[in-house]
Amino acid sequence: MPLIIIAAGVALLLILMIGFKVNGFIALVLVAAVVGFAEGMDAQAVLHSIQNGIGSTLGGLAMILGFGAMLGKLISDTGAAQRIATTLIATFGKKRVQWALVITGLVVGLAMFFEVGFVLLLPLVFTIVASSGLPLLYVGVPMVAALSVTHCFLPPHPGPTAIATIFEANLGTTLLYGFIITIPTVIVAGPLFSKLLTRFEKAPPEGLFNPHLFSEEEMPSFWNSIFAAVIPVILMAIAAVCEITLPKTNTVRLFFEFVGNPAVALFIAIVIAIFTLGRRNGRTIEQIMDIIGDSIGAIAMIVFIIAGGGAFKQVLVDSGVGHYISHLMTGTTLSPLLMCWTVAALLRIALGSATVAAITTAGVVLPIINVTHADPALMVLATGAGSVIASHVNDPGFWLFKGYFNLTVGETLRTWTVMETLISIMGLLGVLAINAVLH
């Protein structure tokens, strides 16, 4: 019954948004309330769950999205993004620029949460599209696929690292297996899949991209342009290394845990960009603040829609759907690796959150390791693969992709949802292949 209610809720949401063109935030909050009541929650519980979902989603994302938009706008409006884009196109050529973005996404994704890398790299994608004339999704999807793959398979990214800690898997082994799986997965879900998306003629959302083409004299140098963009990556990467190698009370680790926090790292990059890209190129502080102010207005509705997705997700979590699915799977006779993937996939589809799906799955299947002696590293990767399948309207990431790529709900289902499902299936096949070779 709980799964039928969820399916009905998703159908209602699609009808409201596609059929009646209801605003995304309003539709998500309304459907969250309807599903909550249908699942047996009382009015106060539904209200608290919606408020908690919005608060917890924005609590982690508001500063990241805000600072990311500010930094992206500064990089875009000062000509830095155009400089980086033209350099990449000149180095790799238009035909290979996708591969440049795949590599960039993998490197950036290792140190960052998906959302941080997404908002940081999108201005670069927009500028490459403007400079090359290539379709937006053809250029952007390979980068997004690379970011998503690191979220599933590659420590020291926080996602697989957290699952590996629960399973007590060796991080080096997990990284090795994950890298083997990553290569074919990102090729299929990125450059190959994006070739099917050239029919989607989309432009970047207004306010998130400056279409002005800068002259050679107006643009900063390549190294000056890239410096502000990579500062967050460097700080977060150092923080990740310190977390693995240094004791918790070590002063150096504590310092880099602070400056390597995603929001703090982005803020530091903004301060640096104000001087290296703004003031250094002759702009006044007032002009720079106007650029920063415009960036916030451009993402306001995107932020609210993501918050609505968080509310829907939290109602599903609080209604006990996760416990229902966990109980449903406890008595199955699936192999440990298939069980990890299946439980994570069901939880992902039902709850929306990849993180919640992965962590819950780890708790459900952890006893299996002791009984079956399954490879913990492969269990981590199977869980990560299952946790990203079929992202749809109850996932805040769905709305993030929709908003920044200027898509309708239907178009997002045919692009983002399919891409995430390809990553999940390729990941499972990779896990099973490695397991067959090793055992």
UniProtKB/Swiss-Prot annotation:
UniProt-annotated location(s): Cell inner membrane
GO molecular function, one term: gluconate transmembrane transporter activity
Assigned keywords, A-Z: Cell inner membrane, Cell membrane, Gluconate utilization, Membrane, Sugar transport, Transmembrane, Transmembrane helix, Transport
Catalytically driven reaction(s): L-idonate(in) + H(+)(in) = L-idonate(out) + H(+)(out); D-gluconate(in) + H(+)(in) = D-gluconate(out) + H(+)(out); 5-dehydro-D-gluconate(in) + H(+)(in) = 5-dehydro-D-gluconate(out) + H(+)(out)
Induction: The gene is located in the idnDOTR operon, which is involved in L-idonate metabolism. Up-regulated by 5-keto-D-gluconate.
InterPro entries: Glcn_transporter (IPR003474)
Pfam families attached to this UniProt entry: GntP_permease
Knockout consequences: Reduced growth rate when grown on 5-keto-D-gluconate as sole carbon source.
Periplasmic-side segments: 1-11, 77-96, 142-170, 242-253, 311-322, 372-377, 438-439
Pathway: Carbohydrate acid metabolism; L-idonate degradation
Cytoplasmic side stretches: 35-53, 115-118, 194-218, 277-290, 346-348, 401-414
Membrane topology, record value: Multi-pass membrane protein
Biological-process GO terms, alphabetical: carbohydrate transport; D-gluconate metabolic process; gluconate transmembrane transport; L-idonate catabolic process; L-idonate transmembrane transport
Transmembrane segments: 12-34, 54-76, 97-114, 119-141, 171-193, 219-241, 254-276, 291-310, 323-345, 349-371, 378-400, 415-437
Source species, domain of life: Bacteria
Function description: Transporter which is probably involved in L-idonate metabolism. Transports L-idonate from the periplasm across the inner membrane. Can also transport D-gluconate and 5-keto-D-gluconate. It has been reported that gluconate uptake probably occurs via a proton-symport mechanism in E.coli.
Family the UniProt entry places it in: Belongs to the GntP permease family.
Protein name in UniProt: Gnt-II system L-idonate transporter
